[in-house]
């Protein structure tokens, strides 16, 4: 993958928070990560990104970056995903990304089971399953304003609106 085709770059300029120079620098970084020169980053390559492998949600993050569900992250998906974490990414973009981490089946809702799975990944063995299920049940009950037993994006957003989630989803990196 030499210089990124201008049509792709033009689309990324329109759809992301990066300028042309930033996209070019990120393209070079992408090419270094793509060790086998396949044009995409597989799970092992994705996990080699500094700070990613130590994140318990790294697998889910990669799945959210992988918009076409191919199992790999191509250049457009890489830039689009990183754009959300840039300082220019909006709070709404960051919250939508966080929501997608929990929405494993991509149906637009966070179910009790999905919330349990993601929280289990995060807390590991620090809580037993019964304690964790109580937290999940309480979280759903307290935030499910329409009573359908699951959280929509708006319910999720309202639940964490007062937290500093958007700030914690901003990466400081040298582009």
Curated annotation (Swiss-Prot):
It comes from Saccharomyces cerevisiae (strain ATCC 204508 / S288c). Ca(2+) 3 binds at residues 103, 105, 107, 114. Residues 21-56, 60-88, 90-125, 131-166 form the EF-hand domain. This is Calcineurin subunit B. Ca(2+) 4 binds at residues 144, 146, 148, 150, 155. Ca(2+) 2 binds at residues 66, 68, 70, 72, 77. Regulatory subunit of calcineurin, a calcium-dependent, calmodulin stimulated protein phosphatase. Confers calcium sensitivity. GO terms for biological process: calcineurin-mediated signaling; cellular response to pheromone; conjugation with cellular fusion; intracellular monoatomic ion homeostasis; positive regulation of DNA-templated transcription; regulation of cell morphogenesis. Disulfide bonds: none annotated.
């Amino acid at each position: 993958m030499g210089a990124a085709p201008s049509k792709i770059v033009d689309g990324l300029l329109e759809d992301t928070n990066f300028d042309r120079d930033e996209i070019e620098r990120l393209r070079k970084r992408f090419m270094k990560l793509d060790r086998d020169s396949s044009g995409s980053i597989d799970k092992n390559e994705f996990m080699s990104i500094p700070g990613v492998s130590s994140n318990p949600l790294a697998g889910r993050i990669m799945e959210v970056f992988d918009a076409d569900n191919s199992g790999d992250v191509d250049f457009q998906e890489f830039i689009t995903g990183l754009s959300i974490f840039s300082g220019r990414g909006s709070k709404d973009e960051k919250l939508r990304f966080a929501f997608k981490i929990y929405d494993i089946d991509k149906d637009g809702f966070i179910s009790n089971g999905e919330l349990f799975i993601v929280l289990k990944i995060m807390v590991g063995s620090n809580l037993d399953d019964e304690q964790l299920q109580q937290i999940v049940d309480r979280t759903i009950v307290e935030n499910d304003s329409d009573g359908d037993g699951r959280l929509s994006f708006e319910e999720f957003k309202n639940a964490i609106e007062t937290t500093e989630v958007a700030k914690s989803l901003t990466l400081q990196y040298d582009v």
